[in-house]
Amino acid sequence: MREEIAAAVVFVTRLIKLNDSIPKEKVEEFSSELSSALVEKFKNHWYETEPTKGQGYRCIRINPSEPIDPAILKAANQCGLQYTDLNLPQELTLWVDPKEVCCRYVFVIIVYDIFFNNLFKVLPKHLLQI
């Protein structure tokens, strides 16, 4: 579970780093807080032998028509940041499942394993700069 959460946190953190107005130390603090929040959230909803079980619960959804994801909001608040400071995309879905982290960024679907083996082969060029 920790490896998958780490992959998700790295992805979200890279998106936040695009916002140069947040100091590096705050981004690192946010990353640590998000990791802790996700471990707490997922601990009773992680099924190694049934990875699709609990999939909806483990989904991190960013969309203007939906409430802010509680784990992201908690991590931001713990760091003294506002959610809007993160400058995350308006549309993002991140599924964190055993052995796989999958992201739909706007309308592009990106799938990568927890070791990022294939990440740089499938990312659009504009995301490689994150």
Segments and roles (model prediction):
Residues 42-116:
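Alpha-helical bundle protein-protein interaction modules that mediate dimerization/oligomerization
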Residues 109-130:
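Extended intrinsically disordered, low-complexity regulatory segments in eukaryotic proteins
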